[in-house]
Amino acid sequence: MYEELNSAQAIILKRKLVENSLTLVKNEKGLVPFYRLDTLKIAAVAISNENMNVFQETLKLYTELKCFNIPGSADDVKFNALIDSLKIFNTVIVSVHNMNTSPAKQFGLSPQSLSFIKKLADKNNVVLSLMGNPYALEYISGTEKMESILVSYDDSEITRELSAQLLFGGIPAKGKLPVSVPAKFKVGTGLQLPLKIRLKYSIPEEVKAKKNILLKIDSIALNAISEGAFPGCQILAVKNGIVFYNKAFGYHTYDKKRSVSIFDIYDIASVTKVVATTPAAMKLFGESKLDIEKKVCSYLSYLDSTDKNKIIVK
């Protein structure tokens, strides 16, 4: 039973169910998905007992942002200090975690955290991501001042990951509220964002990639590093707009002072061959329109009178 529930097919199904359930109940001025990242200075605040979680880690895959974590049990002094720290940001993503199922206990929302959310909505552009029961919105003041509100229904790792992707347009918004939140949102509320504008992150099985092949990539990278071919690298594989492999190996330099991270940002120079010329040549070769045994000047006649006239396409 355990193996069946945790098989690749079962996980893919669960991911699809979660993805289709995520509900954007409010989106003032169309802030979500975030478009002009160059105009946004984003902070991500997790009201959580954890120092860092998958939600924030996934957000960081899309842009540079500052992460803050504070437990719901923190006192007003700490929450107010955090509000002061957030003044320099023009967009604040607040994710609410570790909720419970008890209405009598306000679904685990502490008075301090509720006060914090209200005060923050008065001062900042707030995007709220509620990882729990939508009825909890009844206890949250200031929703009318928030830019966007996403209801995610539970706090699982998959839900956290996909919620972050939705905010940046990695996946569309399709869900609708199954219940009404008194005086705030009616049953069936749910803004539809049918188009994805950025890469989606998922598991290899979603694109039918074979894990044993991906393990070979790991081995090649690690072997190259051990042989001194390069100090480190990041390898990312995408199919149909879905990232199914994204790993970092080794260090940036041979002195091993800084590890390579999947969150590192690189200069995008010298990628034309990889992302343009090579795929185009592969397509033409597959259509029998390019003979790689011929000379380049057979296709680019202006090279015929240069010192490049003997270069073979291959």
Task: List each model region and its residues.
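Preference for extracellular/luminal or secreted protein segments
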Residues: 1-206, 210
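Active-site helix/loop module of the DD-peptidase/beta-lactamase fold
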Residues: 267-271, 284-314
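Short linear capping/connector segments at secondary-structure termini
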Residues: 1-4, 251-253, 295-302
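Short alpha-helical transmembrane interface motifs in multi-pass membrane proteins
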Residues: 262-265
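Short, basic/aromatic recognition patches
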Residues: 206-226
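Solvent-exposed, non-membrane alpha-helical residues enriched in polar/charged side chains
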Residues: 218, 222, 281-282, 297
